[in-house]
Design a protein with these regions (language model features):
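Structured alpha-helical
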Residues: 1-82
Length: 82
């Protein structure tokens, strides 16, 4: 998985409903990632994305709006190894 890849992300909103959208993987490192999406994602929710070979999972630490969309910072789960 490379930066600028399109990925399908999923999370549960505060009421427990499954949500999902397409995102652009802006940045990734061993401790987390930054995704660009078209809608806000609540802070603290668990979010995941990936392919059959690798599933990424973590928690939303920030979600800020910029001119081209929302940027979501994800801290990987402590058990996750990239």
């Amino acid at each position: 998985m490379l930066c600028a890849d399109m990925v399908e992300v999923g999370w549960r909103d505060r009421s427990g409903h499954q949500r999902g959208t397409t995102a652009i993987l802006e940045d990734i490192c061993p401790s987390g990632a930054c995704l660009q999406v078209e809608e806000p994602v609540p802070l603290g929710v668990e979010i995941r994305w990936g392919q059959s070979k690798q599933v990424f999972q973590g928690y939303v630490r920030y979600c800020v709006y910029r001119e081209i969309g929302y940027f979501v910072g994800v801290e990987f789960d402590a058990s996750f190894k990239w």
